[in-house]
Structure formats: structure tokens, C-alpha cells
């Protein structure tokens, strides 16, 4: 099995404005953003994936988990760190491929109500591992490398590789009405900088660095609403379409996920699995009925 530091930890992070600022997100390897409820302007929640979690002093605030999060965590063989969730998640957390820690982290007095005060602090993960039988190593459910990364000396240039298909992508405005997520391309460092609620998203745990990414994967995804309280699940074990965005260009792609533990794969128009650039990756699941409001320009 792999070294302990190679196993991903996946944290559920609140994205209501009162939960800001978020701690630790700028250290994440992959950040997912998706609708968390069909109510409240289809409010989103972050799911952040950390490999070197031990080097991050504070992550959060930590909130509850949803079925979609459990399914997506399984494709990374990640351990989910959360605080509870609706009963709809139980059958997914009970799957043999799912490992999780719930509500076993630290409280930080930040002057906010209790639901916004739980964080993962240094040492919390070690305590959880020592008091459980959850493995720090990849388990038998790990299906191997997730993305195909380009060599850093030969980065992906969509304009060159797909001259007829790539479009300009200096700004990506996501159809998330509650928080208004958007990413702006900086040609100097070739990264996309994330903003929401009309302002830059900064990490006070990292000198107020703005959240930024090398790769954006935007997926259109159907969903099923469970009840009148807004609880829902994305149809993420399925197939669909989307965009891969990097270095100022976007490429229309298709995606496919065949089982709970199988990684989501992305393909170009010729059916070849795409290669992405080395660096941090942002993944957005966009409800299919909001897809037409996605802006890439």
C-alpha cells in the first residue's frame, strides 16, 4: 500500500456568507463546488480534497455531508471529514468503500453561532485515526490514478491541441445564484482566481491568499430532489457534458462515471481521455437546468 501521506482527506466546508472566511482551502489539491440544497438560492457547499493535510493548521468550518459528496469521495478513496448529515447519506456511508470521521474535530470561538465553529486543527486527524480502525493507506477500493497529468515541461495548450474547438476563457461565471461564484484568468501566472459574494475568496490561514486554480472542470449534471426540504442527490454515476478550462482556453468535453469507486473521466470530441495541467483543480457540478446560464468568455 502507499504511504500514509498519499491518502486523500476530504473536508465538507460551509459556503454560507456567514461562514466566511474559510480556512485552509488554498492548500487543497482539489476543490469541488456544488448545489447543497434546492432551497436558499441553490446554495453551494465546498468539498476540499487534501493530500498533505498534516501541514495545514486549520481547515473549515466543517459542516454536514450529502450523498453526492460520499459518492465522489469514493472515487478518490478519500476519508470524508464532516459533521453529520441527513438520513439520506446513511446508505452511502454504510458502503464498504466509505470511510469517514464525523463531528470529532475542534471548536474555535469565532464569535459565530455553533454550527459555524467546527474546524479541523493540527492533531485532530491523528486523534481520529488512533481512536478508529480507519486506515491511513489506500484500501482495496482504490482504482488508481484519477487524472492524466501533462508533463510540466510540456503543458496542455488547448488552443494548439484543439485549434478548431477551443474557445477563449478569461472569465468563468457559474450559475450559482446564492453566492455568485466566478473565476478570472490571470495571464501572468496562468491561474484562475476565485471570487464569490462579489469579492475575492481569501484564506486567512495562508496570508489571505486568494483561492486559485490551474484547472477548471465544469460538469453539467442531473439531480433528484428527495423532499420539500431541498435535500437532493446529483446523478453523478452517469454521463454528460461540460468544459475543461486551463491557461485562458476552454474545451467542450464529455464526462463519464460508471460506479461509486470509479473516477469521473473526461473526454474530447474524438473520445480520447483529456490530459490536464499539473496544479490545483476546481470541479463544479452545475445543475442541468441551470447549465444555459453558465458564462465562459
Residue ranges of model-derived segments:
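A surface/extracellular/periplasmic glyco- and lipid-processing/surface-interacting theme
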Residues: 2-32, 39-297
Amino acid at each position: 500500500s502507499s504511504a500514509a501521506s498519499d491518502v486523500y482527506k476530504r473536508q465538507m466546508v460551509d459556503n454560507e456568507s456567514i461562514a466566511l472566511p474559510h480556512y485552509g482551502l488554498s492548500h487543497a489539491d482539489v476543490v469541488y463546488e456544488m448545489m447543497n440544497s434546492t432551497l436558499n438560492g441553490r446554495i453551494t457547499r465546498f468539498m476540499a480534497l487534501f493530500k498533505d493535510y498534516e501541514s495545514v493548521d486549520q481547515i473549515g468550518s466543517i459542516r454536514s455531508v450529502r450523498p453526492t459528496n460520499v459518492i465522489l469521495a469514493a472515487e478518490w478513496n478519500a476519508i470524508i471529514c464532516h459533521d453529520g448529515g441527513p438520513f439520506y447519506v446513511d446508505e452511502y456511508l454504510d458502503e464498504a468503500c466509505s470511510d469517514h470521521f464525523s463531528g470529532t474535530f475542534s471548536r474555535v470561538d469565532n464569535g459565530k453561532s455553533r454550527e459555524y465553529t467546527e474546524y479541523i486543527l493540527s492533531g485532530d486527524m491523528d486523534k481520529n485515526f488512533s481512536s478508529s480502525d480507519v486506515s491511513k493507506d489506500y484500501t482495496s477500493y482504490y482504482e488508481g490514478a484519477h487524472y492524466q497529468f501533462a508533463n510540466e515541461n510540456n503543458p496542455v495548450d488547448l488552443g494548439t491541441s484543439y485549434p478548431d474547438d477551443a474557445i477563449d476563457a478569461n472569465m468563468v461565471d457559474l450559475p450559482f445564484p446564492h453566492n455568485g461564484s466566478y473565476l478570472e484568468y490571470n495571464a501572468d501566472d496562468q491561474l484562475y482566481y476565485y471570487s464569490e459574494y462579489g469579492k475575492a475568496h481569501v484564506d486567512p490561514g495562508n496570508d489571505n491568499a486568494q483561492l486559485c486554480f490551474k484547472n477548471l472542470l465544469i460538469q453539467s449534471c442531473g439531480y433528484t430532489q428527495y423532499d420539500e426540504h431541498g435535500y437532493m442527490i446529483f446523478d453523478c454515476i452517469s454521463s454528460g457534458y461540460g468544459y475543461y478550462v486551463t491557461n485562458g482556453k476552454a474545451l467542450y468535453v464529455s464526462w463519464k462515471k460508471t460506479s461509486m469507486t470509479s473516477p469521473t473521466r473526461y473526454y474530447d470530441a474524438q473520445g480520447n481521455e483529456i490530459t490536464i495541467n499539473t496544479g490545483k483543480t476546481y470541479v463544479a457540478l452545475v445543475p442541468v437546468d441551470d447549465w444555459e446560464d453558465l458564462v465562459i468568455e
